[in-house]
């Protein structure tokens, strides 16, 4: 065979071939494309595909059983958005970032079809949707099925990493990095895998503490003596067990949960902060990410959320409490020209300070903690989030209640003081005495009727004092914090907030925002910014050292 032609099966091509053949032209020369051996242009070394220097495992949340394969479609949308941003902003890099979906839900057995068998038939569609989505949260909080979910995701992550390394043998040798992007409940499961969190061990410790604190009110002297001996024996046994464990520790090395170290952990629409708060994690005073996720496990933790996402919560106030009054970092629009780097953005207040109208207002404003060099600016996006509106309403209700309470007690005090009574000599002498120094503040209270010593007044102030010390009684470990804790800044910002649209409806976005991260170009550019930042820092180190 000397010549090979390629023909099209389109209808127009067939009509053209028929007409040209009837006119006397050959079939090959009329509508076909002749194929030749060889190549048109010689290939070069630069024509090879770019090397993968960073892989990103994309972990889904709830609802995967309802729509199997959805994580593959979502990852494809995120990969496509990342490719557009790479071509626009990172075209000078010889490497690229690869996104790999992690589908862990379909392989789990859990309760089988038990929940489906007990589901009523009325409104079956809605019930099936809830069983396929929200039921995953109940499975994870169940002590019976939690381990199955954790092991399912852990094994799938390790399997995909081993498979990728087998097909790319030089990935680890050339220092390839691994990051994880988790969504919704997947953030909590991924966090527990990295931290090795075991609620069973904590429950055993709680039971052990309860056993060590029996009721000694009705014990006799002999019973208390035997109980003391039992405590000493248990303490001695615990010391021997610790020594034995210390001897076995060098020979037994604990296998890490993951076969790789996580460079960046991106949480999207994450309820992780709620789970950590319910587990007893309280704000500290260090300002470091190690308070919730040590650097030895993950180099960087970043929390991405939409302002109206009802499932997402902030993580920064769990590290430093006063960051609840500081707005999250606004994520740049993908088409912003010359955006300010995120590490150079200064914290902004959520509620700008107003001019004090009274002494109490000025004290409250002065007591608002803020980092050093933090400008008091309004939020740089259109409108406030629903969370801020709710917070403002709660604070407003509290201030109204406080004002009504003060008016009530002051009114009650005036009515009691209106009764005629002659001032005593002691009181007149006290009036002639010089007033206290300005540095001290005195509270003048009037005696209520039938209370010679001001019983109701003292009860009122004791009630206020008890409410002031209530958090100290509940969480005594967080009481001894210095007044300078409000001046501590975070080492790195963790909470990053997407910008709201100009004509975006908050009620509609509250329904759609939880699943709007996958196709967002802003999110794709944000992810690539932090992934390529490591390569830029690595390349800049030798030049800085030479200087």
From Swiss-Prot:
Gene name as annotated: Ddhd1
Tissue distribution of the protein: Predominantly expressed in testis, in round and elongating spermatids, but not in spermatocytes (at protein level). Also expressed in the brain, and at lower levels in other tissues such as thymus and lung (at protein level).
Pathway named in the protein's UniProt entry: Phospholipid metabolism; phosphatidylinositol metabolism
Protein name: Phospholipase DDHD1
Entry's localization field: Cytoplasm
All copies of domain DDHD, residue ranges: 258-533
Residues the record lists as Phosphoserine modifications: 370
InterPro entries named in the record: DDHD_dom (IPR004177)
A Pfam family it matches: DDHD
Null mutant phenotype: Knockout mice have defects in the organization of mitochondria during spermiogenesis, leading to sperm malformation and male subfertility. Genetic loss of DDHD1 leads to substantial reductions in polyunsaturated lysophospholipids in the brain, and reduced mechanical, but not thermal nociception.
Phosphoprotein in keyword set: yes
Protein family (similarity comment): Belongs to the PA-PLA1 family.
Basic and acidic residues biased stretches: 423-434
Naturally occurring in which organism (per UniProt): Mus musculus (Mouse)
Predominant cellular place of this UniProt entry's protein: cytoplasm
Catalytic activity of the protein: a 1,2-diacyl-sn-glycero-3-phosphate + H2O = a 2-acyl-sn-glycerol 3-phosphate + a fatty acid + H(+); a 1,2-diacyl-sn-glycero-3-phospho-(1D-myo-inositol) + H2O = a 2-acyl-sn-glycero-3-phospho-D-myo-inositol + a fatty acid + H(+); 1-octadecanoyl-2-(5Z,8Z,11Z,14Z-eicosatetraenoyl)-sn-glycero-3-phospho-(1D-myo-inositol) + H2O = 2-(5Z,8Z,11Z,14Z-eicosatetraenoyl)-sn-glycero-3-phospho-(1D-myo-inositol) + octadecanoate + H(+); a 1-acyl-2-(5Z,8Z,11Z,14Z-eicosatetraenoyl)-sn-glycero-3-phospho-(1D-myo-inositol) + H2O = 2-(5Z,8Z,11Z,14Z-eicosatetraenoyl)-sn-glycero-3-phospho-(1D-myo-inositol) + a fatty acid + H(+)
Keyword field: Cytoplasm, Hydrolase, Lipid metabolism, Phospholipid metabolism, Phosphoprotein
Known role: Phospholipase A1 (PLA1) that hydrolyzes ester bonds at the sn-1 position of glycerophospholipids producing a free fatty acid and a lysophospholipid.
GO biological process: phosphatidylinositol metabolic process; positive regulation of mitochondrial fission; sperm mitochondrion organization
